[in-house]
């Protein structure tokens, strides 16, 4: 177990946070640039994006645009800051997060401001494939689904961690890794009054942590139009308990089934 203490100065407007991440023995070796940045968000509900590296005075900034969709001009803005920075790099994680690493304090502050349009809470770091609007074999618009959920829950201002990171795939190809999400969705269809309607299969309790790997259990099919309503109701229930989704789910699997049953076909 490796503890990473992020100590950033007031100019970055980021609170100190302790981060715990499972790493192998090799990750304890000092001075290795490849092992200075751990996964973001580090723990449920943590939104701090500036990470102090092992090297004194060096920082990394995590940037997760909603749905992994980076505005084209954003790369130009980032490049303008890091082009003359020694050893600065932009790395892409499998969960669609960008890490801009090996930054000095002033550079980290500028990158932090430039990337302020990214995810502001755990739920907005949800993973989605590109979806049927671009993918030729995609069945459903996974990006559109994520955008509609984010828009629907935004007015409720749920506390960070109340809604979990979800994974959305537009089809069985599983590019959104829906099987490993705490809540996952996979593109499907549902017949309503004899007409095929856009829908998603619903998966629960997936996990990709080393040693705890498991696929989520498929619970049924939800119409795409019902999924935002499901998350609004779920967020309200968990908010009343003043818990995060993870803590709430530990003792409320049956309650989740009751909420989902309203929307499952």
Describe the function of each predicted region.
Residues 1-265:
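Peripheral terminal and linker regions in Fe-S/redox and tRNA-modifying enzymes
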């Amino acid at each position: 177990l490796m503890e990473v203490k992020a100590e950033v100065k007031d100019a970055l407007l980021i609170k100190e946070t302790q981060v715990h991440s499972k790493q192998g023995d090799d990750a304890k070796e000092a001075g290795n640039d490849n092992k200075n940045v751990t996964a973001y968000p580090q723990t449920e509900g943590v939104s701090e994006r500036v990470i102090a590296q092992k090297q004194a005075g060096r920082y990394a900034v995590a940037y997760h645009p909603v749905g992994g969709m980076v505005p084209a001009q954003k790369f130009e803005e980032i490049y303008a800051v890091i082009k003359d920075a020694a050893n600065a790099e932009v790395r892409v994680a499998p969960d669609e997060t960008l890490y801009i690493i090996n930054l000095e304090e002033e550079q980290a502050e500028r990158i932090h401001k430039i990337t302020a349009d990214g995810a502001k809470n755990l739920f907005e770091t949800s993973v989605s494939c590109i979806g049927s609007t671009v993918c030729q074999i995609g069945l459903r618009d996974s990006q559109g689904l994520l955008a509609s959920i984010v828009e629907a829950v935004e007015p409720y201002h749920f506390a960070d961690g109340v809604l979990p990171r979800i994974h959305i795939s537009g089809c069985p190809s599983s590019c959104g890794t829906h099987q490993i999400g705490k809540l996952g969705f996979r593109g499907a269809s549902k017949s309503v009054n004899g007409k095929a309607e856009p829908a998603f299969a619903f998966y629960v309790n997936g996990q990709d942590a080393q040693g705890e790997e498991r696929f989520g259990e498929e619970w049924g099919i939800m119409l795409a139009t019902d999924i935002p309503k499901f998350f609004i109701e779920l967020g309200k229930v968990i908010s009343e308990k003043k818990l995060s989704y993870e803590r709430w789910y530990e003792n409320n699997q049956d309650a989740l089934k009751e909420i989902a049953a309203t929307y499952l076909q």
